[in-house]
Amino acid sequence: MIFGVGTDILELARIQETYNRFGEHFVHRILMEEEREQFRRSKWPVRYLAMHFAAKEATVKAMGTGFSHGMWIRDVGIVNNDWGRPEIIWSGRGQDVCDQLGIGGGHVSLSDDAGLILAFAVLMQA
């Protein structure tokens, strides 16, 4: 059964401006270590940051918590499997919140076009 759905859209230029201003500090602020490893290998680092930022926002909207109630931006992560499919991962604290809410897993879809990033997340009940 579906626990919740969430979506987020943002302008790539917004993330570009933030990355230009804060650089590596911004990267460490929003990405989990597993994501930073993939970020460093990315051909388009700002696009990577924007897509992951939007995916995190969509995921916490699907949780119904936003970045509050024990959730922080690095408590949810998005990594690509060997096929390139984005998958949701959790920090220990993020997993604890999921357990409390009865969330068993989820899916995320990402798209970009014309300078916009779109993320859609579906979380499943445990």
Regions found by a protein language model. Give the residues of each.
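Core catalytic alpha/beta fold that binds nucleotide/phospho-ligands
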Residues: 1-126
